[in-house]
């Protein structure tokens, strides 16, 4: 967006004072065109500025006339144009100063309103600055030539006035510098213009590095190549002028000018050798990779030589890279710290593409020699680089030119499990390094706001979405990385985060670092959840406590999706259950990994669960997820088979055997307070429970609830051999005893499943009575069962595990689930009514 595009959105009252000497109506007609002219860079009253100002006045009048005619406003605009010409015709520099003041005021107003200027405006201003400097430089070269020719002609005839050959004066006498002074000033202008090009090269390199974290990047080097080539042309012209004026210059002055020109050329040539295609910044040994370099001045200096120079690629350590950067000029050579195969290619000119480049297509790092690391630094924190080097001779004197270019820092790994930590090192270095730094120095602590920008860019680039993170997401991430439950975004604005907090310190109560957890979310979202995130169906970065505050007062079946806080690369469904008394319970279903979602998609899993009704806040789930449902295949397939499908259920939703008064109270208490365990089951027509099992009328008095956060137990009768289990009954979480009065035990101690000995029906003692006298049911009243296997008992101990992996006991109905149990009271929650999502 242009500067005027933002100005037009602001209140006119804030801008009225800017348009006193130049009507706002004319500013509106000129719009973006006005910003594309070098008003801000014509500072001074010399001939160059005067000529440019006159040209701008004429162009402004023509632009206004054309725009007014196109919009049919000629009659109302022509008087303004006439006034403009009458005021500024005699002094066009005054128009330049007026519009420069308006643009500066507009920029200040935009920064106050929007906090930053538009990116395209910045780029255009930088381009205008260089174009103006180059134009001024070319003008000075012409002046120098005229002055030299005047001196030489005057020396022959003695009649030519130098003053008449230089540009006519504007306000007062013209320039009176002699040739040496003018040449020194022109070389100074060349050095200043070269500094603009070198800065632009550094900006390009920095943008290339930031692109590794997802920042948009304009990779084309065509514009930079044109700038470098234009400066080489100026260099050649000045070199000719100094040579032609050797008789008019003192030897010392001439030598100084030549030395300065040579330094300009050397710096320009060595700086124009760039790594256009960077090698992977996380580089695995024995893996092929590509890289490429570009010589911006190759077309001018290499020509069409029969034998192009060869470019070599070598691996260097951080210490070697630092020594190279501090050396005066390119080094003679370095010892490679790794063995790279296929590491030499020719540097060739390509006329069709108008570039000089070398592309390494089959590089392979065979092995790496590790160096001594600093302190507690791990191998995934050790940074290296690829050094690209070449040399060629220049000019009739065969001047040897050596070119070197360092790649961005990279981390070498030998195993895939090092990839995650290596990416953290690269992410930190790319985001927080400075231009012109000593390789590869980077800050140990950075502002949290910069970290938020980095995480947001990385997330959008890695996932491939235009939907970034929201303020609520950053609040949750800050709470996580700082281990601070502050509920205000402002509490973290001025804090700094360290490298150790980012990827060295283990998060409290977890087995992983902040980056390892965040990278797991990136991978899961990229592989399985991109479309869900882009459709804003996933809140994602939100704590369980905040989930409770959002869902507690919502209708039954309201749910949302959040990334697991205690597992790497998991997403869970949190939903509200309302009891008949109106009380609420928030439950979190066991997280799904990328592997789970590759078996059955998230949308289909949500469709499978009937208890999920509305996506928070009030969007029906079918409306929200319909586009993510997989069409169900009906009937037979091409081979005549009836189609099957995999569907998800929550184990709590499976029916329980219904007790009858004739039967003993040998029923597993159902743990309604535990986190439901999502399981995959093939659809079946088999009924459950089996029809042969009689139902109980009541369980209320005989049901025993196990305490929370303990291993599931089986409560057994005194006689361990008097146990039978109904066929196909779900594995019990507890067996309640039923005894005769004379053998009653008031409070039997629960026993672990592993302590119980199960026997087959043939080993059971004969019944000695009927219910409710306390005896166990005979074979004809309750079908005999096969004893549970070791696998069954293992499943019993493992089922209904919490998200953190601990065993959970039974919970009363409508109490918060242990999986999603809140650690703070609702009075401490951030109960914002309008979150960003």
From Swiss-Prot:
Residues 809-825 have a biased composition (Polar residues). Keywords: Acetylation, Activator, ADP-ribosylation, Cytoplasm, DNA-binding, Nucleus, Phosphoprotein, SH2 domain, Transcription, Transcription regulation. Residues 517-632 form the SH2 domain. GO terms for cellular component: chromatin; cytoplasm; cytosol; nucleoplasm; nucleus; RNA polymerase II transcription regulator complex. The keyword Transcription regulation applies. Gene3D superfamilies: EF-hand (1.10.238.10), SH2 domain (3.30.505.10), STAT transcription factor, all-alpha domain (1.20.1050.20), STAT transcription factor, DNA-binding domain (2.60.40.630). It is found in: Cytoplasm; Nucleus. One of its GO terms (biological process) is interleukin-4-mediated signaling pathway. Tyrosine phosphorylated on Tyr-641 following stimulation by IL4/interleukin-4. Tyrosine phosphorylated following stimulation by IL3/interleukin-3. Dephosphorylation on tyrosine residues by PTPN2 negatively regulates the IL4/interleukin-4 mediated signaling. Mono-ADP-ribosylated by PARP14. One of its GO terms (molecular function) is DNA-binding transcription factor activity, RNA polymerase II-specific. Its main location: cytoplasm. Residues 802-837 are annotated as: Disordered. The modification Phosphotyrosine is found at residue 641. A motif (LXXLL motif) lies at residues 793-797. The modification N-acetylserine is found at residue 2. PANTHER family: SIGNAL TRANSDUCER AND ACTIVATOR OF TRANSCRIPTION. Belongs to the transcription factor STAT family. Forms a homodimer or a heterodimer with a related family member. Interacts with NCOA1 via its C-terminal LXXLL motif. Carries out a dual function: signal transduction and activation of transcription. Involved in IL4/interleukin-4- and IL3/interleukin-3-mediated signaling. This is Signal transducer and transcription activator 6.
């Amino acid at each position: 967006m242009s500067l005027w595009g933002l100005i037009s959105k602001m209140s006119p009252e804030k801008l009225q004072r800017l348009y006193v000497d130049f009507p706002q109506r004319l500013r509106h007609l000129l719009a973006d065109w006005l910003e594309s002219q070098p008003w801000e860079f014509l500072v001074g009253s010399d001939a160059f500025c005067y000529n440019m100002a006159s040209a701008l006045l004429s162009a402004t009048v023509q632009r206004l006339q054309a725009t007014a005619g196109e919009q049919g406003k000629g009659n109302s605009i022509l008087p303004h144009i006439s006034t403009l010409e009458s005021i500024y015709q005699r002094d066009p520099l005054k128009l330049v100063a007026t519009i420069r003041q308006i643009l500066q005021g507009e920029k200040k107003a935009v920064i106050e309103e929007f906090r930053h200027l538009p990116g395209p405006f910045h780029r255009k201003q930088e381009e205008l600055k260089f174009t103006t400097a180059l134009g001024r430089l070319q003008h000075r070269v012409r002046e120098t030539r005229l002055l030299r020719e005047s001196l030489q002609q005057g020396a022959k005839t003695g009649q030519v006035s130098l003053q008449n050959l230089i540009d006519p004066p504007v306000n007062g006498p013209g320039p009176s510098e002699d040739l040496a002074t003018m040449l020194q000033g022109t070389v100074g202008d060349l050095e200043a213009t070269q500094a603009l090009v070198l800065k632009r090269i550094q900006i390009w390199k920095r943008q290339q590095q930031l692109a590794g974290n997802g920042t948009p990047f304009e990779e084309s080097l065509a514009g930079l190549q044109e700038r470098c080539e234009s400066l080489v042309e100026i260099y050649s012209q000045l070199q000719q002028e100094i040579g032609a004026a050797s008789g008019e210059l003192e030897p010392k002055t001439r030598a100084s000018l030549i030395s300065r020109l040579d330094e300009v050329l050397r710096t320009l040539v060595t700086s124009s050798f760039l790594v256009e295609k960077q090698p992977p910044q996380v580089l695995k040994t024995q893996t092929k990779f590509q890289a490429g370099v570009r010589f911006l001045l190759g077309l001018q200096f290499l020509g069409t030589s029969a034998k192009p120079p060869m470019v070599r690629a070598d691996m260097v350590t951080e210490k070697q890279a630092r020594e190279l950067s501090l050396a005066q000029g390119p080094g003679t050579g370095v010892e490679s710290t790794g063995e790279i195969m296929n590491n030499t290619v020719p540097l060739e000119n390509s006329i069709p593409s108008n570039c000089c480049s070398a592309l390494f297509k089959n590089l392979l790092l065979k092995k790496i020699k590790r160096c001594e690391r600093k302190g507690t630094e791990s191998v995934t924190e050790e940074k290296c680089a690829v050094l690209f080097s070449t040399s060629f001779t220049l000019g009739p004197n065969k001047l040897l030119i050596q070119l070197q270019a360092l790649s961005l820092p990279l981390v070498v790994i030998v195993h895939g499990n090092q990839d995650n930590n290596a990416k953290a090192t690269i992410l930190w270095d790319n985001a927080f390094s400075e231009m012109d730094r000593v390789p590869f120095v980077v800050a140990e602590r950075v502002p949290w706001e910069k970290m938020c920008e980095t995480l947001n860019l990385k997330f959008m680039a890695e996932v491939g979405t235009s939907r970034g993170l929201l303020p609520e997401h950053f609040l949750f991430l800050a709470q996580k990385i700082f281990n601070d439950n502050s509920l205000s975004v402002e509490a973290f604005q001025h804090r700094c985060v360290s490298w150790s907090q980012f990827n060295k310190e283990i998060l409290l109560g977890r087995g992983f670092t902040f980056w390892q957890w965040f990278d797991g979310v990136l991978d899961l979202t990229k592989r399985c959840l991109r479309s869900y995130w882009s459709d804003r169906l996933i809140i994602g970065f939100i704590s369980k406590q905040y989930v409770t505050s959002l869902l507690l007062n919502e209708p039954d079946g309201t749910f949302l999706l959040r990334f697991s806080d205690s597992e790497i690369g998991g997403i869970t469904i949190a939903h509200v259950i309302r009891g008949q008394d109106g009380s609420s319970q928030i439950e979190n279903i066991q997280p799904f990994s990328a592997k789970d979602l590759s078996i059955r998609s998230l949308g289909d899993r949500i469709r499978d669960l009937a208890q999920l009704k509305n996506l928070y806040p009030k969007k029906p789930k079918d409306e929200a997820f319909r586009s993510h449902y997989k069409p169900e295949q009906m009937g037979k397939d091409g081979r005549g088979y009836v189609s099957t499908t995999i569907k998800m259920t929550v184990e709590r939703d499976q029916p329980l055997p219904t007790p009858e008064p004739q039967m003993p109270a040998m029923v597993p208490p159902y743990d309604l307070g535990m986190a439901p365990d999502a399981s995959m089951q093939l659809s079946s027509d088999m009924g459950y429970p089996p029809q042969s099992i009689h139902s109980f009328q009541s369980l209320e008095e005989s049901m025993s609830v196990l305490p929370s956060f303990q291993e599931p137990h089986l409560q057994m009768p005194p006689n361990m051999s008097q146990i039978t289990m109904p066929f196909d009954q779900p594995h019990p979480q507890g067996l309640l005893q039923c005894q005769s009065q004379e053998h009653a035990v008031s409070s039997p101690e629960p026993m672990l499943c592993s302590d119980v000995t199960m026997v087959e029906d043939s080993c059971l003692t004969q019944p000695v009575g009927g219910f409710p006298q306390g005896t166990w049911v005979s074979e004809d009243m309750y079908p005999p069962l096969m004893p549970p296997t070791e696998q069954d008992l293992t499943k019993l101990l493992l089922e209904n595990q919490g998200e953190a992996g601990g065993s959970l006991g039974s919970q009363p109905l409508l109490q918060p689930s242990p999986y999603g149990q809140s650690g703070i009271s609702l009075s401490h929650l951030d109960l914002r009514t309008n979150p960003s999502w």
